[in-house]
Amino acid sequence: MRIGLVCPYSFDEPGGVQAHMLDLATVFIEQGHFVQVLGPASAETDVPDFVVKGGGSIPISYNGSVARLSIGPQVTRRVKEFIRDGDFDVLHIHEPNSPSYSMRALSIAEGPIVATYHASAASSRLLQLARPVLSPMLEKIRGGIAVSEMARRWQVEQLGGDPILIPNGVDTSVYAAALQHSAAASNNAGDATERPLEIVFLGRLDESRKGLDVLLDALEHIDRPIRVTVMGGGHARSRSGVDFVGRVSDLDKARILGRADIYVAPNRGGESFGIVLVEAMAAGCAVVASDLEAFAAVCNVEAEQPAGLLFKNGDARDLAAKITRLIDDEHERRALISAGIQRAEQYDWDHVAAAVMQVYETVQDGTKVRVG
C-alpha cells in the first residue's frame, strides 16, 4: 500500500505527535508498505529519508503549549506536489483541525482520507467560530481515529464525527531491552540494594504545564536518599542533587528510564494521552503522575492493581508523600512496576499499527488520493 502521512507540527522540535508519526511510518515501511511523511522541517533538520521537508515554521501558542506551524502559499504548493507525486492509496492526516499542513491537505485532497485526533481541551471558542468552514472539510474524512477517550470526546463535542479509539504506540522492546541491560549491569556491580533510588522527569523545562517546578518543590519535602535525573530541553535550574542532562536521544531516554526506579509525571494540564508514561512502564519504572484524566486512563487506576500512582495535580506535598511511600514500600513499588509492564504491552506498535491498517483497508475503494 502507498501511504501518505501529513503532520502539522514542525520536526525541528521534538513532540509527541511527530514521534508517533515517525514510529508509525517506520512500522509500516518494515512491513513492506511505501510511506512518506509531509510536515514542517527546516533544511538542516535531521529527519528520516521518508520525511518530505515542508520548510520553516512559526511558534503559535495553543492549549497551554507552543506549536510550530507552517502557513503561507508554499504550504498549498507543497501539499499538491506531495499528493501528485505520492500516488497514495490512503492519505492519513494528523490533527486536521490545525491551521498548517494538515488543514490545508484536508481542504485540497480527495479520495481515501483518514484523520487522527491527538489534542483535547475543555472548550474552544475559536473552533466553534470556525466550525462552518471546517465542517465541510471534515466530512471528507472516511475514517477517524482518536488516540484517547479525551481526544475523542473533545472532537465529537466540538466538531462532530465519530472517531474510533486507537491509542498511541510504543516500541516496548526498546525499553524492555534497556531494563534488561540495566539489571545485568546492576548484577555485575554486586548488591545494589543500598544505592539511592533514582527518580526521573522528562519534559520541556520552560513549559509550566509540564510541572517540573512541582517536582522540584516536592523534593524539598523528601528526606530519603535519592538521585534525580531531569531530561528535556530548556533552561536548567541550579539544584543540588538534581542532574539536568538536557535533550536526549531516544536511545539515551530508554537507557535512563531502564535504570530508573520511579518516573514522575507532574504535568499540570493540556495532556490527552501521556506516551512517556507508557515508555516508563515498559522500561520498568514505577509511575507517579498527576491526577489528570488522561494519565488516570493510562495508569488504569480503576483496575484491581493500577499501573501507576496518582497525586493531586499541582500539590507538591502530596507528590512528595507518594514518592516517599514508594521509596519505603518496596512491595508496592514492585507491584506497580509489574502492572506497568503488562499495561505497556497493550500499547505496543504491533497492536496499534494493525488497528490503524484496518482503518486504511476500510476506507479504500480502489481509487487513489488526488488533488481536488
Residue ranges and their predicted role:
Residues 153, 167-195:
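Acidic anion/phosphate-binding donor-loop and adjacent secondary structure
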Residues 286-289, 296:
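Short hydrophobic beta-strand element within catalytic cores of glycosyltransferases
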Residues 121, 127-143, 150, 157-158:
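Membrane-proximal helix-turn-helix segments that form the acceptor-binding/catalytic region
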Residues 318, 325, 332-346, 358:
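A short, well-ordered alpha-helix in the C-terminal region of glycosyltransferases
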Residues 185-210, 216-220:
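Conserved donor-binding/catalytic core segment of Leloir-type glycosyltransferases
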Residues 41, 150, 169:
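Carbohydrate-associated surface elements
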Residues 301-316, 324-330:
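Conserved acidic donor-binding segment of nucleotide-sugar-dependent glycosyltransferases
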